[in-house]
Amino acid sequence: QTTARRVAALWLSLVLVAATGASPVHAERLVTDMAGRTVKVPDKVARVATIGPVPVLNSFVFAMGEAATIANNLPPNLGGSRWRFQYVVAPQIATLPVIQSGEGPSVEGVAQVAPDVVLTMDRPTIDLVERTRTPAIYLAWREPDDVKAAMRLLGALYDRPDAAEAYCRYFDETLAKVSARTDALRDAQRPRVLYANLKNLTQPHRIAEWWIAKAGGKSVTDDGRTSEAFNFSIEQVLHWDPEVIIVSAAHEIADAYADARIAGVSAIKNRRVYAVPMGAHVWGNRTAEQPLTILWAAKAFHPELFKDVAISEEVRAFYANFFKSKLSDNDIDVILEGRAGEH
């Protein structure tokens, strides 16, 4: 815990700036973001704009229980039913302005929503936002544990360190719960796993190499790369012979089973093709829901080891405790079956 406190202090220095006789309404604080920048922010943050990978950033805010503070809608390319749970958790964003397009963020849009702070994972955005005299906080998620540093930074920003620590505790405890059952598995007991877009023949996000391993699997695309995407061929799929295939949406399962090119692959023959869940974001990519990803994958890879784990109840509790959102049974089914984009 001492080490954790030191790390938190390094990333999240939060200093009250006292002004003699100043009204509390105008009080300000200094926050150090994940680029090492010291940023002056209002004492109370009530409105935030998210620019860049908006669903990821929103998921951080959701996990703080602060969905109501988001002041902008999703970009146009992220509209439609696939992102429905962004609107379930933060219904107000449906009628709020869009402040970025495929060409990038809009200075006018930022000025229009008048946020207290802009959250971004894009360094060039910082310079643009500062033209509006709006504080910009940079968050990073390069390595798996960065999500905890990001949450602690938001805990400082919202003056809710307790909420940030609750999330970090859940993250660590969930991983420990899975590891307690999978650490003793021999290599032969860990299934070969391919997480992929089979239409484009890509593995879209490097973080999948981490959660597949944490869940007790062996990612066939894990070659130690540092780039995000991984391209491969059908011949490589046949060579890898994955025992489990994970696709990005429910409708892709039927496509995989119908693809004659991979009919002889173990995952196809044994009917072990699954759609990764989709809630606030795709669970296979970067999202605050990542602990749930690992638990879901562990149960998919090792159903006997995790037969006592009710994933649906984990999802219900996570959304209630962190996102402050009550899900129906149908909502949970849609999330877990990867059907968010299907009508």
Task: Give, region by region, the residue ranges found by the protein language model.
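Bacterial N-terminal signal peptides
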Residues: A8-G21
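A short, structured surface patch at a secondary-structure boundary
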Residues: T50-V113, V117, G217-V220
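Bacterial Sec-exported substrate-binding components of ABC uptake systems
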Residues: A19-F60, T95, D162-L194, F306-H343
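Proline-aspartate-enriched helix->loop->beta-strand connector
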Residues: I99-G102, S106-T120, T134, S233-A250
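Alpha-helical, coiled-coil/dimerization segments enriched in small aliphatic residues
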Residues: H205-A229
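N-terminal secretory signal peptides that target proteins for export/translocation
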Residues: Q1-R5
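Short beta-strand->loop
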Residues: N72-P75, T120-D122, Y138-E143, L157, ...
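Structured C-terminal subdomain patch of bacterial secreted/periplasmic proteins
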Residues: K148-E165, D183-L185, I253-H343
